[in-house]
Amino acid sequence: MDRGVLPLPITLLFVIYSFVPTTGLAERVGCDLQPVDPTRGEVTFTTSQVSEGCVAQAANAVREVHVLFLDFPGMLSHLELTLQASKQNGTETQEVFLVLVSNKNVFVKFQAPEIPLHLAYDSSLVIFQGQPRVNITVLPSLTSRKQILDWAATKGAITSIAALDDPQSIVLQLGQDPKAPFLCLPEAHKDMGATLEWQPRAQTPVQSCRLEGVSGHKEAYILRILPGSEAGPRTVTVMMELSCTSGDAILILHGPPYVSWFIDINHSMQILTTGEYSVKIFPGSKVKGVELPDTPQGLIAEARKLNASIVTSFVELPLVSNVSLRASSCGGVFQTTPAPVVTTPPKDTCSPVLLMSLIQPKCGNQVMTLALNKKHVQTLQCTITGLTFWDSSCQAEDTDDHLVLSSAYSSCGMKVTAHVVSNEVIISFPSGSPPLRKKVQCIDMDSLSFQLGLYLSPHFLQASNTIELGQQAFVQVSVSPLTSEVTVQLDSCHLDLGPEGDMVELIQSRTAKGSCVTLLSPSPEGDPRFSFLLRVYMVPTPTAGTLSCNLALRPSTLSQEVYKTVSMRLNIVSPDLSGKGLVLPSVLGITFGAFLIGALLTAALWYIYSHTRGPSKREPVVAVAAPASSESSSTNHSIGSTQSTPCSTSSMA
């Protein structure tokens, strides 16, 4: 019975025993590898190996600092950047400072759900699709990587550094690696482990050849994984997808000794691997691998032993995490890459989606304004002949760096409701190309008023501008007038205790920061609310602070958000402890008084005892001195405590 037509479960578990090829056969297999037509097959992979990088753990750090150096060959590239939070052992991801350094223009599709984040980048090179809901820091003009790393180190302990060549997508896993060293020193060809995985944009070269003297149509797919910089146990996931439903095929996987395989295939195949492997439909069953030659010709010779007539796909890759092999057909059709044909690339490769993402209107002072960066338009290779509102007589003004389109609310076809202003923007191109149209809306901030109120009870009855240390505070952001056109959310809040104090984070990325900050239900009118408990242990104790909240506002008919910051000045007072407890001077005074009274009483009792008992022989008195440093040590510890966080557990006494 032909093995190639065995039922899938049987053939997936079929183990090929090791065959040791002779040297002559390995050198003379009669199979000249040639590049394959890209339309005949595709190989994609993700890897954690970067051209240069490092991973470190920042002990006791409140902020992670990650630095990505992006090197692109073309004038414009696209990148998908995803940040994933780690919640090992139930701990939340701490604050993150991410530095993006790019050598060319890049459009970034960014995802970072519910992660407190600061981004530092050069806005003239890095363009985000949609405004990221994070804190932005302008990257200073620095000329070398060392200068950038020195600057990044001032923001906190560096957790990871990675240099990537032409990435298409990056997944950065946040959190501390307990096995990493405490210092991040970049190394060439570094394996970033679970911290970072990325997919290169460059097409993976695939080779193929026909084995001389072998008849039939049995195909071989060979994947060779090259060793990485670090030898550690690793499982490589291989997804093999063939479009045909019948045929005889062989899959040969070769890798370093520490690599095992998890195989996901949709076709009956013979499997030959180094290292143990398991298949998706039987994940619990592991099959031992065999010893295979460590050369391309040796692996081809193994395919020949299994009666393969064609090596349909031969691929060599660096140490990868996942690899996907797709073949458009099978059954013995062999086709190498055709001779290149000289073609003239189209002059206009403008992306309408990316161009329209640059249209971001702003409203204020009864005027809608949008500015289109001319450099970004040129980077997109777009040629614009006109930028107007719905009323074509309202045209953009051409400045040195921007095309600026603006209009009062009363003209150019503006549609104005109580709090939202809308219009249509039309972008015209040279003759022959249809214009692009985009409906734009923005919130009229002048029509809304915002007030930040502090209350001392959960009933929110009487506002106050004074907070007592150790007392729970209740905060409400009031928006007037009431409207259903705009929804308001608390994006972030913090309490600034001044230049000599701390910045106390209360809310980050719409999530309570700490166990003593609580997001409350909105008011009956829909106003956002939260509460916090502040205990400050600083010398001297701060007497004032500034409470600031960043609000995210969104029109009910639009997904794009705008932001508004509201602040209020707070007075901070120490609690009146007359009926609640004793402060440190009182405690010391009472202690000294009690000691003095006790000493006098002891002396009096000893005097009475010594003069009233009989003249019997007295025993010697032995005095044991208490350590003199105990009291001063306690005092020093209380003075040295400096901390300000919501619901801090530090102590002053």
Curated annotation (Swiss-Prot):
Major subcellular location class:
membrane
Q: Which cysteines share a disulfide bond? A: C31-C209, C54-C184, C244-C330, C350-C382, C363-C442, C394-C412, C493-C549
| Residues spanning the membrane | 582-606
Region of interest: OR2:
48-201
Q: Name one GO biological process term.
A: vasculogenesis
Quaternary arrangement and interactors, per the entry? Homodimer; disulfide-linked. Forms a heteromeric complex with the signaling receptors for transforming growth factor-beta: TGFBR1 and/or TGFBR2. Interacts with TGFB1. It is able to bind TGFB1 and TGFB2 with high affinity, but not TGFB3. Interacts with GDF2, forming a heterotetramer with a 2:2 stoichiometry. Interacts with ACVRL1. Can form a heteromeric complex with GDF2 and ACVRL1. Interacts with BMP10. Interacts with DYNLT4. Interacts with ARRB2.
The record's PANTHER family line, in alphabetical order, gives: ENDOGLIN (PTHR14002:SF1), ENDOGLIN/TGF-BETA RECEPTOR TYPE III (PTHR14002)
| This protein's name | Endoglin
Organism of derivation: Mus musculus (Mouse)
Underlying gene? Eng
